[in-house]
Amino acid sequence: AFSTFTATYQVIPEGTDLATYFEENAVPDEGLTTMLCYDLQPGGEYTMSKSVDFGNKQVTLRTTSISNHAKLKLTADNVSIKTGTIFALKNLDIDASQSFDPLISLSTPDESIKGTGDYYIVRGALTINGCNITGVNNNLIYDGNKKYCYESVVINNTMAHLTLSSQTNVSGNAVIYFKGGFANTLQVSNSTIWNTGDSDSKYFVQYNNSGRATRAGYNNSNVNFLNCTFYNIAKTGQWANYGGFNGQKCSYFDVERNIFVDCGNKQVIRRILGGRSASSYDVVKTQFNTYMFDGEFESTGGIVENYDVTGNCLETDPGFKDAKNGDFTISGSAQLENKTGDPRWIKTAE
């Protein structure tokens, strides 16, 4: 497949500790206005021995090979990747198992981006694309309790194996946790996220309850889950918590072709819609979702009353091959027929 890549700014030699590298090679001021792409070598092994804070500089850490990822291992218990602006991780295998801090944490904001509603507004995306992340003991993304409004947070074509730990506070918050602010658009697509830790998050996504599109100068917000597989997250909690979105005409939702198993206390779509009926919003798209919890379904006759009302919820077991060990290959006929969940688990017969 042909893929276009932004020009390389620097190639970082394999075997490098990225903490040392960025101490010795500070991101230049060019990064204030231009995305700078740092390439890790295909198949190369890298470490990060302490947190790296990119602040207000736009950085992509990536492997240019989509088939031979560089491997990045966090090597201390308090390592986070920090940013306060547009940022991306692409085509990386990340081992976060030694760190008990959030994988991505937002920096002290640059005062110059303070805007409508006193939000620190980042006009661009925080992106995780094409990554395989293991050993996430704490939040995947945390806003550092700063009043950020990111235009978008995008997770695509990524596997994130959470090992949520009782040594952190994650049981009281979320996998994607904006304590001070919110993401105006959250899009999770073509991805698999699951938890096998000794703890669990209370929510998959949580924003500060004041967060709302119009309060930060946007016309509408979006929460989009598209072709994803989710397993064993917020099992006794709630999938989503963002009081400022609830029942607002400016809140848009798109939830299509996902498989949720043992998530969100059998109320996934209800919580995505903030406990308000689909009819209370201008834009709610739902189709071909599976909501299975302890072998039962949220839906009856293809409908979750008031919430997923298109009429085509799937009520067959997706038949994961070995969920406990991270193999979510599906065997469920309805899921195969409608090509649902993360596409990587739809295996065609040889």
Where is each model-derived feature located?
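N-terminal extracellular ligand-recognition/capping segment immediately after the signal peptide
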Residues: P13-V27, L32-V59, I66-D77
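Extracellular beta-strand-rich solenoid/capping regions of secreted or surface-exposed proteins
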Residues: E45-T60, K71-V122
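Short glycine/acidic-rich loop motifs that flank beta-strands on beta-rich extracellular proteins
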Residues: M48-S51, T75-D77, S97-S105, V136-G144, ...
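Right-handed parallel beta-helix
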Residues: T85-A96, G117-N137, C149-Q167, G172-S199, ...
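C-terminal accessory segments
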Residues: D308-E350
